[in-house]
UniProtKB/Swiss-Prot annotation:
GO biological process, one term: pentose-phosphate shunt, oxidative branch
One Pfam family matching this protein: Glucosamine_iso
SUPFAM superfamilies for this protein: NagB/RpiA/CoA transferase-like
Principal cellular location given in the protein's record: cytoplasm
Keyword Metal-binding belongs to the record: no
Species the sequence originates in: Saccharomyces cerevisiae (strain ATCC 204508 / S288c)
Keyword field: Cytoplasm, Phosphoprotein
Gene Ontology molecular function, alphabetical: 6-phosphogluconolactonase activity
InterPro entries reported for this sequence: 6-phosphogluconolactonase_DevB, Glc/Gal-6P_isomerase, NagB/RpiA_transferase-like, PGLS
Classification of source organism: Eukaryota, Fungi, Dikarya, Ascomycota, Saccharomycotina
Name by which UniProt lists this protein: 6-phosphogluconolactonase-like protein 2
Modified sites of kind Phosphoserine: S42, S64
Record's keyword annotation contains Cytoplasm: yes
Gene name for this UniProt entry: SOL2
UniProt-annotated stretches for the region Disordered: 59-85
Length: 315
């Protein structure tokens, strides 16, 4: 593995992280929803022709295709529209990231919630009412608090709660949700999210991809894998895979707290260790950003960048 260095933005306080992440999310949203001729320079190192082709394919099957038991909620009526619809496709993990988004996004008036398709990077197989549920936490901390009359209602794609006792069936079902949302596997080899948001746990796992679960880390074909006997938290989960993460238009890690400093040091200084986030840094090189507070960067030898808030589509 080469020593690919991502962009690392450092911040003093949690509130600073939240504000910058929210700006970054809105910038990604604006780039995804803008007319093609306004997106020329939105992201470096990507062929915009290829990106446009992928986006157009992804829009062939709109978010309403996954309504109902297969795991979608939102404002869609369920009726198909022949006209292609621009959507901002975002994947979220759970944990402290939800708090960051709660703090940063809800106070902004430029979030076009009604144009969002929200998927989950992973899910703990617990009831949605549990504080361990990524969807449940996102619903209570973010989705239920959106002024939908003003900003619209996002379409939200979660697991089928009735399948939480069967990790393989739950993973297969959620993969079908992704397939419907991204035009079908016969025409799209991998889904392309406009933005993939991740945290990183002290043990190095991202989404629900754990460092010592090599079969999951080496998975090349499946979009979603079951996770059993997870070493921390709920033992059964599902997770989107490394190829799906790395195929995203942007991949962003959000990390806070001194407890994360040792693992961040390993990720940044010892990429050859092959931790999941190091694999993503390499696999999505040029499209990865880290938003990290000073505590999590304690004794970490990296070049820190100052985040510049965006106006328009320039980076």
């Amino acid at each position: 593995m080469t020593t690919t260095v991502p962009k690392i933005f450092a911040f003093h306080e949690f509130s600073d992280v939240a504000e910058a992440v929210a700006d970054h999310v809105v910038h990604a949203q604006d780039g995804a929803l803008a007319p093609k001729n306004e997106r020329k320079h939105s992201v470096p190192n990507i062929s915009m022709n290829a990106l446009d082709m992928t986006r157009e394919a992804s829009c062939k099957s709109t978010a309403s295709a996954a309504e109902g038991k297969s795991g979608s909620s939102g404002s869609g009526s369920g009726s198909s529209k022949p006209k292609k619809e621009k959507r901002f496709k975002i994947a979220l993990s759970g944990g402290s990231l939800i708090e960051v988004l709660h703090e940063g996004l809800l106070k902004r008036d430029d979030v076009r919630w009604g144009d969002w398709d929200i998927y989950f990077a992973d899910e703990r197989l617990v009831p949605f009412s549990s504080n361990e549920s990524n969807y449940g936490c996102a619903k209570r901390k973010i989705l239920d608090l959106i002024d939908t009359a003003k900003y619209g209602t996002p379409k939200v794609y979660h697991i089928d709660e009735s399948l939480i006792d069967d990790p393989q069936e739950c993973a297969d079902n959620y993969e079908k949700v992704l397939i419907r949302g991204f035009a079908g596997r016969d025409s799209v080899k991998l889904p392309m999210f406009d933005l993939f948001l991740l945290g990183c746990a002290p043990d190095g796992h991202i989404a629900s991809l754990f460092p010592n679960f090599q079969d999951n880390l080496r998975e090349k074909l499946a979009w979603v894998v079951p996770v059993e006997n997870a070493p921390s938290g709920p033992s059964t989960r599902i997770s989107l895979t490394i190829p799906v993460i790395c195929h995203s238009h942007r991949v962003t890690f959000v990390v806070e707290g001194a407890t994360k400093a040792p693992i961040i040091k390993t990720i940044m200084e010892r990429p050859e260790k092959g931790l999941p986030s190091s694999i993503v840094n390499e696999g999505a090189a040029g499209r990865v950003s880290w938003f990290v507070d000073d505590d999590a960067l304690t004794d970490v030898l990296v070049t820190k960048k100052k985040y510049k808030f965006h106006q328009g589509l320039s980076i």
